[in-house]
Curated annotation (Swiss-Prot):
Keywords from the UniProt entry: Ribonucleoprotein, Ribosomal protein, RNA-binding, rRNA-binding
Biased composition (Basic residues): 66-84
This protein's name: Large ribosomal subunit protein eL19
Subunit and partners: Part of the 50S ribosomal subunit.
Biological processes per GO annotation: translation
Pfam family of the protein (one): Ribosomal_L19e_C
Length: 155
């Protein structure tokens, strides 16, 4: 029951892959199928429904849908699931907001306590806005290096 030749012809005729060709397993049709050696013979078998095209398989996607729903509920997001550094999972804008708010809060504190004047506050504020300071520590270093604030006033 070797129908490789007929399968190849049917695949050519129907324009699909050989794996999608279904040939009837009926033993009574065996000789007739084996005798089909021309494209015309195979076409006749296709017309009679002895040879058919199987539907495409495709990807089910069910597992990924279930995973997605679980993640929406907050599952599968624990420490053991995480790869990469913590900052890789943080939105860059979110990181920027945390950083700039901390720096601005500190600058406001210094201005309100009159440790720095309005002019210095404004200059440092604009530098912070421009991304000059990587974190609060770098702002404090900057102020200490330039003597903008006495050492003991930098808390």
């Amino acid at each position: 029951m070797d129908y490789r030749f007929q399968r190849r012809l049917a695949a050519e005729i129907l324009g699909v892959g050989e794996s999608r060709i279904w040939i009837s397993p009926d033993p009574e049709l065996r000789e007739e199928i084996e005798g089909a050696v021309t494209k015309a013979d195979v076409r006749a078998l296709i017309k009679r429904g002895v040879i058919k095209v199987l539907p495409e398989k495709g990807n089910a996607g069910h597992a990924s849908k279930v995973r997605h729903l679980q993640r929406r509920k907050g599952r599968r997001r624990g420490m053991g699931r995480r790869k990469g550094v913590a900052t890789a999972r943080l939105d860059p804008k979110e990181r920027w907001m945390h950083r700039i708010r901390k720096i601005r809060r500190y600058l406001r504190y210094l201005r309100d306590k009159q440790v720095i004047d309005r002019k210095t506050y404004r200059r440092l504020y604009m530098l912070a806005k421009g991304g000059t300071f990587r974190d609060l520590a770098s702002l404090k270093r900057y102020m200490a290096d330039r003597g903008l604030v006495p050492e003991e006033k930098i808390r």
